Amino acid sequence: MELRTKKTTVMGLAKTGVASARFLAQQGARVTATDMRDETALATVLSELAGLDIRFVLGHHDEADFTAADLVVVSPGVPQEHPLLRKTTEAGVAVVSEIELASRFITAPLVAITGTNGKTTTTTLAGELFRANGFSTYVGGNIGDPLIDLPASGEPVERAVAEISSFQLEWISSFRPKVAALLNITEDHLDRYPSYQAYINAKLRIFENQTADDFAVVNRDDELVWQAAQSLKAQLFPFSRRHELTEGIFSREGELLFRHHGQELSIPTAGFRLQGVHNLENIMAALACCLLLGCQRETSLELLNRFEALHHRMEFVREVADVRYFEDSKATNVGSVAKALESFENITLIAGGKDKGGSYAPLAELVQQRVRHLVLIGEAAERMQQELGDLTATHKAATLEEAVQLSADLTAPGGVVLLSPACSSFDMFKDYEERAQRFITAVKRL
């Protein structure tokens, strides 16, 4: 793709927008970068891009920068139905996401991983598996560095692994991973999408341009994912905790079995550091992606036996008075909380925060079976109590610190206190990381 002298506009100057503008300028494009924030708010961004031939339009957008451009690159935070983008496409101008732009310049086999939950752990693990097996590997996308930083660096790599969000998939046209993985789909981001189906459709676009030469790694146990997978053009490679597979990877007592083209590999699970049923699925998905692209069993097993859980994903904090405390602040939707609840019994669950629009009803059975006490915080507390409060002993707390102390008082020896909110954090905290740190601090003060 030739970019030299092309009129390009980058909409939105968050992390991917900055990286895209830098790359386009390096390629010799005529770059306009535009953001609704003003110069003061973007001082750090402007210093990052200083010295590059970029024209900035700040505090507003000019329609002509879009409709008269050769190419518009949209940051994932910009809604797809933005009026300016509608006018741009009507004018016949190509609109792409940063991952679409990046993929046109990446020559290494690309592994792209999406799903409502587990993306970051699976992506990180896949990258570490490739590296342990001796492949020079770039890991980025929705975590760490934007995917466009790979071609921008000019560094040759043998494998690329990208975490991909539904937002990033909205503006693809030729994006084609060698291996695309869809881990699961549950209700999320209904504050962004007009319907659950629209969110599902966005996720499924990860497979859109694959052919029979590519692989689609999909969750056999997620009926929605599995049904959608039947119409894909790529070779299906499922993973499952519940089904034995003739082609795919599945768990059996004490081992994972990887079956591909008549060959079988057994991978013992006893030494895995990652715990929880959700992490077993993440491990299977990552292994599938990597074993399909040249990784070896022995080296991969060595890595799995030392790979630790990422922060804020069902992370053990400490044990006090024979009660274990786990922090799962990244669990901002019902699907991720369900996986956490499946991993424990005798739970005191701290949940709540800023409501994201989905139903909490899918948690009902697990709450009834496994949660002894439900401690609710934040804006969503009232609605969560309406949907789940009759299923177990339910309490409200004004602060997270109060919730931790209340949970300590309520939980019997042998039990588990789990922060797994099913909500975003923005009603009470800057982000999920601050919520996690406040929880950890409160637990350490017990």
Swiss-Prot record:
The biological process GO terms on file are: cell division; cell wall organization; peptidoglycan biosynthetic process; regulation of cell shape
One Pfam family name from the record?
Mur_ligase_M
The UniProt record lists the keyword Chaperone: no
**What's the main place this protein lives?**
cytoplasm
Which pathway features in its UniProt record? Cell wall biogenesis; peptidoglycan biosynthesis
Q: What does this protein do?
A: Cell wall formation. Catalyzes the addition of glutamate to the nucleotide precursor UDP-N-acetylmuramoyl-L-alanine (UMA).
What's this protein's name?
UDP-N-acetylmuramoylalanine--D-glutamate ligase
Species annotation: Trichlorobacter lovleyi (strain ATCC BAA-1151 / DSM 17278 / SZ) (Geobacter lovleyi)
Name the gene for this chain: murD
